[in-house]
């Protein structure tokens, strides 16, 4: 999609969102040459702040190829925000409902029309204590295998310094630098002739996330952990510790009662 076809609603959103971004933040944008000039494609982006969709959208808007985000369906229900979401062609995600596959179909359709669909593969803000990308969901992998379109990894850093994950108190000053870096397409060709089994989807997802993490290492100038943070594993470990604590407490109580 060329800049001439961006449309009224996306231009309106840009008019509203760009001025505060320009005033509040400095920019360090790299890798724009990797954003395809034509044809449908996926961008896969790390997620570490509630405001990083705006900083990333600003980056890509300036390439002339606007992204279609997958966003929770509640944003499409009422008010001005719903009008903007619908008008800019964002894609609602209906989690755990009979409409859950609609987002997949809509993403595939958008790519086949020559548009860009932006995925946050982690599905939510990272829970990694040091804000590295964590284990991801398979949505981007599914669409990539279905369409065989280019998958552009994107790393971003800086919005999280202004508004950390799960924080409600922004710290805009001193001005932070929004760093965004796109990389070359992830080579997924070895998966194209395979059935999208859970194992294949997991491997494709890990390949995409490895590319994002490598870019973020370059942006941050430091090494990521060898193993991505796994929130499910962390929750299980917390439950095990809680269960051990409960068992220990019960044993000690029984010992006291028998005295």
Task: Annotate each language-model stretch with its function.
Residues 105-109, 178-210, 214, 218:
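A charged, well-structured terminal subsegment
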Residues 218-233:
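Short, flexible loop/turn segments with low-complexity composition
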Residues 110-140:
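Catalytic-site beta-strand/loop segments enriched in glycine and acidic/polar residues
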Residues 59, 84, 109, 142-146:
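Hydrophobic/aromatic ligand-binding patch that stacks against planar heteroaromatic rings
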Residues 1-31, 37, 79-88:
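A transmembrane-helix-recognition feature enriched in membrane-embedded lipid enzymes
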Residues 130-199, 229-235, 239-243, 247:
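A cross-family acyltransferase "interaction/gating" segment
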Residues 36-97:
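Catalytic core of membrane glycerolipid acyltransferases/transacylases, capturing the structured
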């Amino acid at each position: 999609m060329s800049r001439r076809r961006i449309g009224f609603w996306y231009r309106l959103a840009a008019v509203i969102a760009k001025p505060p971004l320009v005033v509040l933040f400095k920019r360090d944008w790299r890798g724009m040459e990797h954003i395809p000039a034509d044809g449908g494609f996926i961008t896969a982006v790390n997620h570490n702040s509630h405001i990083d969709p705006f900083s990333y959208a600003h980056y890509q808007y300036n390439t002339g190829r606007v992204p279609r985000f997958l966003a929770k369906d509640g944003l499409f229900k009422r008010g001005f925000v719903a009008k903007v979401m619908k008008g800019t062609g964002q894609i609602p995600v209906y989690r755990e409902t009979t409409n859950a596959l609609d987002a997949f179909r809509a993403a595939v359709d958008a790519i086949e029309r020559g548009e860009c669909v932006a995925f946050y593969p982690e599905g939510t803000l990272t829970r990694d204590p040091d804000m590295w990308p964590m284990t991801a969901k398979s949505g981007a992998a599914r669409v990539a295998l279905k369409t065989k379109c280019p998958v552009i990894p994107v790393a971003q850093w800086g919005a999280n310094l202004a508004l950390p994950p799960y924080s409600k108190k922004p710290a805009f000053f001193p001005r932070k630098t929004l760093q965004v870096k796109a990389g070359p397409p992830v080579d997924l060709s070895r998966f194209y002739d395979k059935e999208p089994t859970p194992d294949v989807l997991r491997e494709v997802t890990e390949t995409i996330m490895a590319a994002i993490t490598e870019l973020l290492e370059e942006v941050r100038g430091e090494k990521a952990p060898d193993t991505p943070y796994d929130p499910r594993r962390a929750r299980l470990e917390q439950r095990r510790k809680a269960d051990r604590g409960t068992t220990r407490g019960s044993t000690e109580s029984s010992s006291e009662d028998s005295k």
